[in-house]
From Swiss-Prot:
GO terms for biological process: pyruvate decarboxylation to acetyl-CoA. It comes from Oryza sativa subsp. japonica (Rice). The pyruvate dehydrogenase complex catalyzes the overall conversion of pyruvate to acetyl-CoA and CO(2). It contains multiple copies of three enzymatic components: pyruvate dehydrogenase (E1), dihydrolipoamide acetyltransferase (E2) and lipoamide dehydrogenase (E3). This is Pyruvate dehydrogenase E1 component subunit beta-1, mitochondrial. K(+) binds at residues 150, 198-199, 201. The keyword Mitochondrion applies. Tetramer of 2 alpha and 2 beta subunits.
Length: 374
C-alpha cells in the first residue's frame, strides 16, 4: 500500500492532486426520518458494509491493525475484506500501536486513506503522540497545505468485566484536541453513515464504537442501505421528540436514554432524546433549540464526570440559552473512579436507566431559586 503512494509521488503528482478523489459527504438534516425499514442490520454489519463499499469505491482506502486480516478482526468487523481486497489493503500488524499508527499517519501524508483499527481505544494511548502531535496538528502547522485523511476506529468505553484498562471512555479526551473530529455512533444507521463520512473526510477522525453494540440489530431503510448514503459530521439526531425535558446522549447511552424516556412517558413526563452522533464538532444549535423548547436539560455520558462532554454541553447552554432554563442542569456520568472488575461494582460505575429517570424527575420538579432569577 505504501508502495502505491511512492509510485504516485514518483510520477510527479502533487499531494493536492492525490486528494482530488475526495467525495463530499452528503448534506442532510439534523433529524432524519425515513420510510418503513427495509431490513434489520447489526452495528457490526453496518460497519463492515461501510468499509467494504468505501474500499471498493476508492483504491486509496485501506485497513490496518491487529488481527484485521486473517482473523477478520477481533470483533469480525473486517469479515471477508482480506479475501476481497488482499493483503496490500487489509494489513495485519504487529502488536505495536505506536508503530502501525505512525505508519498510518505517514500513509495519509502521502494521500492514502488509512483506517486504523485499535482492538480497544484504551490501547490508543500507546499511539497518542502520532494521533495528537502528527495527525491532529499537521494541517494547522502546514498552513493548510497538508491534509491527513485518516480514521482511528475501534471499541470505546465499558464492555463487560474487562477491567479498568479496557473500559475507559475517550470521547472527552479526543474532543479536547483541535484538528480532530470525534464521532460516536449508536445505531446501525449511525455506524454506516458516519463511518462513510469519516473515511471521506480530509481530516483525522476518531471513530468511537462500542463493543456491546456490535451485535445489536436496528431497523434500516432502503436509503440507508444505498451505497451513496452518508451522514453529515457535526449533526445530532433527535431520536424522540418531547416537550418537558431534553436528554443528550451518545453511543450506548442513547439506548438507555430512550428506555428512560419510555418510563417517564408513563408518568406524564415527555422527554426529548438527542443522539449527539458527533462530539467534535458538537451540534450546539440542535441542543440549544431543544432546551429552549423544553426548558430543562439532562446530559448523559459513561465517561468520567470532571471536564467531560456533559460539562461542555452545559456550558454551551449557559452561554446561549441560560434564560430559558427553568431548573438547574442535571449531569449524569460514570463514577469518578477507574472501572471496577467485579460485575456488581461495574454496574454501579456506569449510568443506568434508573439514574436517568431520577435525574429527569429532579429537573422537572425543581425550579431555579428566586434569588437566581432576581
Amino acid at each position: 500500500m505504501l508502495g502505491i503512494a511512492r509510485r504516485r509521488l514518483g510520477s510527479g503528482c502533487a499531494l493536492g492532486q492525490l486528494m482530488q478523489a475526495l467525495r463530499p459527504a452528503a448534506a442532510a438534516a439534523a433529524a432524519r426520518t425515513y420510510s418503513a425499514a427495509a431490513k434489520e442490520m447489526t452495528v457490526r454489519e453496518a460497519l463492515n458494509s461501510a468499509l467494504d463499499e468505501e474500499m471498493s469505491a476508492d483504491p486509496s482506502v485501506f485497513l490496518m491493525g491487529e488481527e484485521v486480516g486473517e482473523y477478520q478482526g477481533a470483533y469480525k468487523i473486517s469479515k471477508g475484506l482480506l479475501d476481497k481486497y488482499g493483503p496490500d489493503r487489509v494489513l495485519d500488524t504487529p502488536i505495536t500501536e505506536a508503530g502501525f499508527t505512525g505508519i498510518g499517519v505517514g500513509a495519509a501524508y502521502q494521500g492514502l486513506r488509512p483506517v486504523v483499527e485499535f482492538m480497544t481505544f484504551n490501547f490508543s494511548m500507546q499511539a497518542i503522540d502520532h494521533i495528537i502531535n502528527s495527525a491532529a496538528k499537521s494541517n494547522y502547522m502546514s498552513a493548510g497545505q497538508i491534509n491527513v485523511p485518516i480514521v482511528f476506529r475501534g471499541p470505546n468505553g465499558a464492555a463487560a468485566g474487562v477491567g479498568a484498562q479496557h473500559s475507559q471512555c475517550y470521547a472527552a479526551w479526543y474532543a479536547h484536541v483541535p484538528g480532530l473530529k470525534v464521532l460516536t455512533p449508536y445505531s446501525a444507521e449511525d455506524a454506516r453513515g458516519l463511518l462513510k463520512a469519516a473515511i471521506r473526510d480530509p481530516d483525522p477522525v476518531v471513530f468511537l464504537e462500542n463493543e456491546l453494540l456490535y451485535g445489536e440489530s436496528f431497523p434500516v431503510s432502503a436509503e440507508v442501505l444505498d451505497s451513496s448514503f452518508c451522514l453529515p459530521i457535526g449533526k445530532a439526531k433527535i431520536e424522540q421528540e418531547g416537550k418537558d425535558v431534553t436528554i443528550t446522549a451518545f453511543s450506548k447511552m442513547v439506548g438507555y436514554a430512550l428506555q428512560a424516556a419510555e418510563i417517564l412517558s408513563k408518568e406524564g413526563i415527555s422527554a426529548e432524546v438527542i443522539n449527539l452522533r458527533s462530539i467534535r464538532p458538537l451540534d450546539r444549535a440542535t441542543i440549544n433549540a431543544s432546551v429552549r423548547k423544553t426548558n430543562r436539560l439532562v446530559t448523559l455520558e459513561e465517561g468520567f464526570p470532571q471536564h467531560g462532554v456533559g460539562a461542555e454541553i452545559c456550558m454551551s447552554v449557559v452561554e446561549d440559552s441560560f434564560e430559558y432554563l427553568d431548573a438547574p442542569v442535571e449531569r449524569i456520568a460514570g463514577a469518578d473512579v477507574p472501572m471496577p472488575y467485579a460485575a456488581n461494582l461495574e454496574r454501579m460505575a456506569v449510568p443506568q436507566v434508573e439514574d436517568i429517570v431520577r435525574a429527569a424527575k429532579r429537573a422537572c420538579y425543581r425550579a431555579v431559586p428566586m434569588a437566581a432569577t432576581a
